[in-house]
């Protein structure tokens, strides 16, 4: 075995950069996982390098094809694309770990033949007993005592019917690396023992296959979550061996991205609703808004600007600018940013994006009628400036797609009306009845109601218009009142005021 302490670290820059996104297909896509994908994508696009998409699907008990399909759906929705990997192909196929067993077995054979791996027969009980006998903490772990077993000693274990695990012979030196996010990180010699890479049944562990895949695929920069920081020295130790046997050319650069925190400054858990990417999509986040917010979980464009496009992110993104401190998922800020991006949409694009949410709430059918489409196009400008989530559309707009007879009234809105509401409705109906159909426009409707309620009855606008808003929309909050009346038309507006007046008079 050759000296293992002075192996080169990659110097790849620009188009030579190769990053990877290699999730396990378990559960629904987590915002922390997608943030990792986004940062890798942005770095690849910024440098002109390549993003490799690899699937780590070797946990048969937890992995599922359904989770894989959800992951693909999430990436496509956010327009995070990749240059090589599953679904795209490339020179290093296959890109699923479950299909790469022969490659791992070949590397294991080379590592064993070169002396980097050695057989370990010890049981957990025997390891604890050795630690006790030496006066050490029994839970201290393995003490490397099998490094230099003779062939006779190994054969004796085999004769007992034992099958060996394979451990990596860890260099007896400090292991340091320059983390792209955190600076120099050093693990002193002896920080961890020789560790198992292959189970006694011959199955390679994640600690082997992940770095081997990175090496075989020429990955130059490993950008991943902070939770994997502690495994990095083991991977570097393995890289020393992989370079020795010609599987790798250099050690990649590592960058460990900060935790995403939830409420109470606890790490965002898969059990937290905020962690579920599809939960945000279902509520009405748009890709542009969610991408922007995920980018802010550890990075920023400038100190005084939070709203930016994905292309602005690509232009500016450098992993060296990522903040190592934990990033808190602030739902209110995320929603506010999403609203900013909603207002940046072209009006016709915005209107079209509302349709699935209106359909899901049965406000409109699978196919919009001509009248429904015209109503949506006319109403969209009234709500675009007010919405933070597309999922607000049914509550804000459903009243425009029904009739006076079928309009549902919010009980709380009706009960909150003042005692003079019937008088307000009657006066408004009388005034509006005198407006000719041909002159039913915003200016005249507003003028008539203002003269009647504000000037004539001496009411404050909030109290005067409250019953009218409930009357036409069924709710306390709606798009602008006069514009809504014009969209509904004179007859429908008066019919709705009459219906509410009738309800209050019962």
Swiss-Prot record:
Subcellular location: Cytoplasm
Reactions accelerated catalytically: tRNA(Glu) + L-glutamate + ATP = L-glutamyl-tRNA(Glu) + AMP + diphosphate
Keyword Transport: no
Key words of the record: Aminoacyl-tRNA synthetase, ATP-binding, Cytoplasm, Ligase, Nucleotide-binding, Protein biosynthesis
Residue ranges of the motif 'KMSKS' region: 267-271
Residues binding ATP: 270
GO molecular function terms listed in the Swiss-Prot or TrEMBL record: ATP binding; glutamate-tRNA ligase activity; tRNA binding; zinc ion binding
InterPro entries, alphabetized: aa-tRNA-synth_I_cd-bd, aa-tRNA-synth_I_codon-bd_sub2, aa_tRNA-synth_I_cd-bd_sf, Glu-tRNA-ligase_bac/mito, Glu-tRNA-synth_I_codon-bd_sub1, Glu/Gln-tRNA-synth, Glu/Gln-tRNA-synth_Ib_cat-dom, Glu_tRNA_lig_a-bdl
Record-level GO BP terms: glutamyl-tRNA aminoacylation
The protein's Enzyme Commission number: 6.1.1.17
Short motif ('HIGH' region): ranges: 23-33
Family: Belongs to the class-I aminoacyl-tRNA synthetase family. Glutamate--tRNA ligase type 1 subfamily.
Summary of subunit composition and partner proteins: Monomer.
UniProt xrefs under PANTHER family: GLUTAMATE--TRNA LIGASE, GLUTAMATE--TRNA LIGASE, MITOCHONDRIAL-RELATED
Protein name: Glutamate--tRNA ligase
Gene of this entry: gltX
């Amino acid at each position: 075995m050759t000296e293992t302490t002075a192996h080169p670290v990659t110097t790849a820059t620009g188009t030579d950069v190769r990053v990877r996104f290699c999730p396990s297909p378990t559960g629904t896509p987590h915002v922390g996982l997608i943030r990792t994908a986004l940062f890798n994508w942005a770095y690849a696009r910024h440098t002109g390098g390549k993003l490799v998409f690899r699937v780590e699907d070797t946990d048969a008990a937890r992995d599922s094809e359904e989770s894989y399909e959800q992951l693909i759906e999430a990436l496509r929705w956010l327009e995070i694309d990749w240059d090589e990997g599953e679904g795209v192909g490339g020179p290093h196929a296959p890109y699923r770990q479950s299909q790469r067993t022969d490659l791992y077995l070949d590397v294991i054979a080379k590592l064993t033949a070169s002396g980097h791996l050695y057989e370990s027969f010890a049981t957990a009980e025997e390891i604890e007993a050795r630690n006790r006998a030496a006066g050490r903490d029994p839970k201290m772990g393995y003490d490397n005592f099998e490094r230099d077993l003779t062939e006779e000693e190994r054969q004796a274990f085999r004769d007992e019917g034992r099958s060996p695990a394979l451990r990596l012979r860890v260099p007896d030196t400090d292991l340091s690396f320059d983390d792209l996010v955190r600076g120099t990180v050093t693990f002193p010699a002896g920080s961890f023992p020789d560790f198992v890479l292959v189970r006694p049944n011959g199955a390679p562990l994640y600690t082997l296959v992940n770095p081997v895949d990175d090496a075989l695929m020429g990955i130059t920069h490993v950008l991943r979550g902070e939770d994997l920081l502690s495994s990095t020295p083991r991977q570097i130790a393995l890289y020393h061996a992989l370079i020795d046997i010609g599987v790798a050319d250099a050690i990649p650069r590592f960058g460990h991205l900060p935790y995403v925190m939830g409420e109470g400054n606890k790490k965002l858990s898969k059990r937290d609703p905020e962690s579920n990417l599809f939960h945000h999509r279902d509520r009405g986040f748009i890709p542009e808004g969610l991408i922007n917010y995920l980018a802010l979980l550890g990075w920023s464009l400038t100190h005084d600007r939070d709203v930016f496009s994905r292309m602005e992110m690509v232009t500016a993104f450098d992993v060296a600018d990522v903040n190592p401190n934990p990033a808190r998922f602030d739902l209110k800020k995320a929603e506010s940013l999403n609203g900013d991006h909603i207002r940046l949409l072209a009006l016709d694009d915005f209107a079209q994006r509302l349709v699935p949410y209106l359909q899901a709430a049965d406000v409109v059918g699978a196919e919009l009628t001509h009248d429904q489409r015209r109503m949506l196009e006319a109403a969209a400008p009234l709500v675009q400036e007010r919405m933070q989530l597309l999922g607000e559309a049914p509550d804000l707009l459903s009243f425009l797609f029904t009739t006076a007879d079928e309009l549902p009234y919010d009980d709380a809105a009706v009960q909150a009306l003042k005692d003079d509401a019937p008088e307000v409705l009657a006066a408004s109906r009388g005034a509006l009845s005198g407006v000719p159909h041909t002159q039913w426009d915003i200016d005249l409707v507003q003028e008539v109601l203002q003269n009647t309620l504000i000037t004539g009855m001496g009411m404050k606008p909030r109290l005067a218009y409250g019953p009218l808003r409930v009357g036409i929309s069924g709710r306390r909050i709606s798009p602008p009142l006069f514009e809504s009346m014009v969209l509904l038309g004179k007859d429908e507006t008066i019919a709705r005021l009459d219906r509410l007046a009738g309800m209050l008079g019962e």
